[in-house]
Every structure is written in structure tokens, then in C-alpha cells.
């Protein structure tokens, strides 16, 4: 651990002599007020909400897929394989993201990836065999993997270069809020109606974010 930490410091030491790529602008209105004004701009809140929805769904799936598998008597091996498929296809999607971005706009990619993810979440609730669930998760992992980095791109496109650090911070704060709230709601749904209901709830969350994509 110590060796890896020291290795990680090597590029940081080299960066200390580099000049900032964007010159900082003096903030005369205060950080909080500046953040509020930034979020009020057209498209920013919608972009943050899309990011919240996609990141929350990706995290909640990791927790509730094993529970759903247990409820349907999947073997531990099958559950582990399904989780590996989700992670693997998400990673795989990043390899194709550059080519997809060259062919399609950010709006088109976000629109279709969110629709596909929504349909996959609905389908998961009715997948009662490991093979069926694994196939659905394969598609969902890819579509969620496409959507996550695009929300960062969307926030960047909506702001000036001098404001991007604050905009990205606002996006991250939205993600953390979603990662706090959505699992709590998902737990309540699972306790009342089973893990399948969680997937329906996630589909509803993604469906509401589709309208935010269109507004952008």
C-alpha cells in the first residue's frame, strides 16, 4: 500500500510546475451564491438530475441484483457472474464511447442509452432465470456505461471554462444526494414488495430523467 501511494505521487510532483489550463476568475458574489446562480441556468439542473439518476441506478443495481438472485434461488456463482457481466459491459462501453460520440450527438446518446436502461430495469423485474437476467444486465451495463460519462460532458457543454470546476462539483453533490436517497427508497420498496419492485422503481427514476434529456 505504501509503495503504491509513493508511485501515485510521482505524476503529482511533475504537475506542480505546470500552469493552469484555465485562468481563475475572482469570485465577488461568494461561492454559495455563485453555485446557486449556476444551477439556475437553463439546462444545468436537468443535467445534474440526469447524472443523479444514472449514477444512483448503477450503484443500486450492484446491491439489489444479489438480493433478487437470492429471492429467485440463483446460485452464488450465478449471482457473481451477473455482477461481473454488469461491470464488464460497463467497462466495455467506454471503449466504444469515442466512436459513438463521433457518430451521434450527446443528446442522441443520452436519450437512447437512458431509454434502453429504463426498459432493461423493467425487464429485470420479470427475469427469473440467471441466463435471462444475465442477458438483460449485459445490455443495461453497456447503456449505463455510456450514459455516465456523457453527463459530465453535458455539464461541461452548458458552462464556461472558468465555471466548470464548480459545475462538476454541483454534479458530484447531486450524485451523492442520489446515492443517499435512492438506496433508502429502494430498501423500503424491497421490504414491502421484494427486490423486483426495486427495478421498477429504478425504471421510473430513469423515465423521469428522459424528460430532462429532452429539455436539454
Predicted features along the sequence, with ranges:
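Intracellular juxtamembrane helix-capping segments at the cytosolic ends
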Residues: 146-159
